[in-house]
Amino acid sequence: MTKSTYFLFIALTILFTHCKKEENKNFVLKGSVTDARSNAALNNVNILVEQQLLEGGSFGGFFSTAGSATTSGGGSYRVEWDNANIVEARVTGSLAGYITRVYNLSASAFQPGDEISQNLSLYPEANIQVNLSKTGVVPNATQLNFRFENAEFDCLCCNNNWRNITSSVTDSTYECRVYGDTWLKYRYEVVNPGETVFMRDSIFCGRNNLSILNIQW
């Protein structure tokens, strides 16, 4: 090998390596999305990847869109975007009939050219309406206490805390968005002076349905 040929070989090697690095400089997030109840693959799920950046030595403090995609028929997705100084990252999966879910990602896991995997599972949505009705005249000191005991809610208005209804209230109705295809356990108490009568039961909330729970006291 002549001297000129040797240097040409070295130059081409460096150029090829540089180009290869340039090709692989992007961040890549991939994975699959399934139904959290049935484990079936979900297609047409909207995938949104967001990031917070460190720019000019300062922390931006807000999320910006890094990339987006839609899952295939097999539930898989792949998002690729330009690498940057990420300090926080998250991926969101959303689909009609399901509760939107956000996954926080490790910013340090992202390296240029590497493919990071993150699978998502979405819960089907359901709604429940609770009707608490007083059927007759009750003593002034009587009170109805009601609560769910194991519900997973997707609205700020609902939780598993007690709801207390006094005898001055004729009826009370409220509705909550919950994780579907599950049995919700509940308990209610009718509190009279010197006596408390309670009942425990459950109601099934099927996906994409409104379940109605009527309690009379």
Predicted regions mapped to residue ranges:
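Extracellular beta-sheet/turn segments enriched in Thr/Pro/Gly and aliphatic residues
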Residues: 106-125, 129, 196-217
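Compositionally biased low-complexity segments at domain edges in trafficked proteins
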Residues: 122-151, 215-217
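A short, solvent-exposed loop/turn motif at the edges and junctions
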Residues: 82-112, 189-198
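Short, acidic Ser/Thr/Gly-rich low-complexity loop/linker segments typical of extracellular
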Residues: 55-76, 154-170
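A short, amphipathic beta-strand motif
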Residues: 29-35, 75, 126-135
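Short, ordered, surface-exposed loop/turn motifs in non-cytosolic proteins
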Residues: 38-59, 136-156
